[in-house]
Amino acid sequence: MRVPPTRLMGLTPLVMLLGVVFAAEASPVAKVAYRRIDVQDSVTGELFPVALWYPTHAAPAPLFLTASLSACGLPAIVCRLISFEMQLAKNASPTDGKFGLIVISHGAGGLSLNHRDLAMALASHGYVVAAPTHPRGKDNDISGVSVWVGRPKQVSRIIDAVLEDTDLGPHIERKRIGVVGHSNGGYTALALAGAKPSTQALIAHCQQHVDDARFCAFGSPAAREATRRIGDIPDVRDPRVRAIVLMAPNAAPFDDEALGRVAVPVRAYGAERDDLTLVRYHADRLAKALPPGTEYLLIKRAGHFSFVASFPWALRFVVGEAARDPEGFDRDAMHEVINPEIVDFFDRKLRADEPDRRGGAQPAPSHPTAAIREGRCCDDDQLCGAPLELIALLGFYQTVSRAILRAVFLVD
């Protein structure tokens, strides 16, 4: 039986208590190691970076990573403002044993570190986690082949690369592979799980639902025209993917028949105030069209980007909308609830002895969650090609300078 949509009034004290209890039930079992690999896109031939988190016995230390997965080489006090800090054992050996593999696919304009807190939670509970920065994804390129065909194939190539890795490959249980996808990453997960995408469905969606205007106007006119010209999208299903989690997913490229073909367990999250992928046309529709057993939660007051981990302080000036939530919504509190939920979902659905991969025999605990929005990485076209850390420092400098001028010289 499908778990019905849940409408929640934000994160109340009771919900917070439930989240603490739930997190306690899923206490970490391992320290977390990190390293980076590069994988070749089978469509464009480009190399793209993939962040790997995995269980280890090695002692962690503070690691400051930039958006490009490089180490921040500035003083720690500066790195904390402009880079992503995690407690990790860099390049350490994995622990003994067998692990599941989870690939996390970000939304358009996103990065491999968008869902780093979820990656840490999964890795500390015995999963290898791989999160790419999809080729051209950080540039909000949603044109034809690079997204509709490229993204799912990139995830399949990541699975290949991890299984072939001499250190991690022998530890992966091949029947315990899942995908988490946010926004266009949700499209990616659905396509890998057996829902055949169609550009005709996408075009029809935008013709029929003119009120989904922001989604249908997303990207450049050239990118939208490239999508119209792509023609039939091939079936990119990967039978190795045994369960998926969707967060504020893009459902427009799928008709109901395609969604009915998904034959793996699904847990989906919608955001009530998602103004990029309107919930009634995307997450709510998925909940009705996916096969029985789908677990669905609609989060009250959440926005499209509420699923993305919080950004370092100075980077919030750069990423803009992706760092903001609807008024009154607590992103960090929501993540304290959703991360253990997702760990629990994969624990239940990717059990090594689980013969049936469709739906869930037992409904997941109904705790709240959130969602996400996608926009340009910056507003200044001359700066959009620069490293996020440089843009953040410039933005921080400008903000402080204006504040000093206003305070000292009464300049507006």
Give residue ranges: language-model regions:
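Acidic catalytic loop of the alpha/beta-hydrolase fold
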Residues: A252, R273-T277, F305
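Domain-level recognition of soluble alpha/beta enzyme cores
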Residues: S27-I102
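Alpha/beta-hydrolase active-site loop
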Residues: V145-P170, Q207-A213
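Alpha/beta-hydrolase fold nucleophile elbow
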Residues: H171-G181
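Short glycine-enriched nucleophile-adjacent loop
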Residues: L163, G186-S198
